[in-house]
Amino acid sequence: MPKNIVFPSRKERMFGWIYALLGVELLPYILNFICSGVGITLTGSQLNLAYFVVNFLVVCLVFRRFWVRTGKAVLDRILWCVLMAAAFFAVYLLLSQSVGRLIFWLKPDFANANDRHVAAIADSYYIPTLVCTVFLVPMTEECLHRGAIFGGLFKRNIAAAYAVSTIIFALVHINWLVGDPFVILLSFLQYIPAGLCLAAAYHLSGSITAPILIHMAVNAIGILALR
């Protein structure tokens, strides 16, 4: 286990907190406003893809020094990162299956609304959706949720870092849902295994590379299953 975890700087973490809690929610409205202002009409799917790309570019720009530090450090621990990614990917699969069985027992007709949303986008733009969900989204979300939020709390309280980063990660994926509160609760529960395993992979590998690899693998399984 590496002695030092590569975290974003204090300024990067501050931006990450603000952007994860506010910017991510406001960006779709900002994009829509800009497109309307210049006379461009986008479908819902096109707007979502634009959202993924702009989100990624903003995070890359702000966290550019963090990416440089991560790139330098990962060369010394690449095998350990891959090992941790493989280990926690396996743990995620086990936990996810267990939670899935519980959800099926509680509500046999449950379906993940976020998955249906991505499937609808992929139905019209499969390759762009694959690129965004497998590559851009994992790098963006890991920078924000593990790098900024988990990293911002880690030195103060490790348990809080795990709990808060996992809860916010889950909420971001369901905050647009409306309807049956029980279904929303089950949707929230579905993201807990991923949040915990991604945080643990970052903690024990010492590099954001490990959770990014896991996140990419999970999303790849989901998007390839749509083919």
Regions found by a protein language model. Give the residues of each.
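Interfacial transmembrane-helix boundary/kink motif in multi-pass membrane proteins
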Residues: P2-G23, R65-Q97, R101, F154-A160
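Residue-level signature of transmembrane alpha-helical entry/exit and packing/kink sites
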Residues: R13-L21, G44, N48, F52, ...
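Alpha-helical transmembrane segments in multi-pass membrane proteins
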Residues: W17-R65, N112-A120, P128
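Alpha-helical transmembrane segments of multipass membrane proteins
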Residues: V24-N32, Y51-V59, F88-S96, S165, ...
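Juxtamembrane/transmembrane-helix boundary motifs at the membrane-water interface
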Residues: L26-A50, R101-L106, L177-V183, A220, ...
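Juxtamembrane helix-loop-helix connectors linking adjacent transmembrane helices
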Residues: I40-T41, V68-V137
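Structural signal for the C-terminal ends of transmembrane alpha-helices
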Residues: C60-T70, A201-L204
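Transmembrane helix-loop-helix hairpins at the membrane interface
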Residues: S124-R227
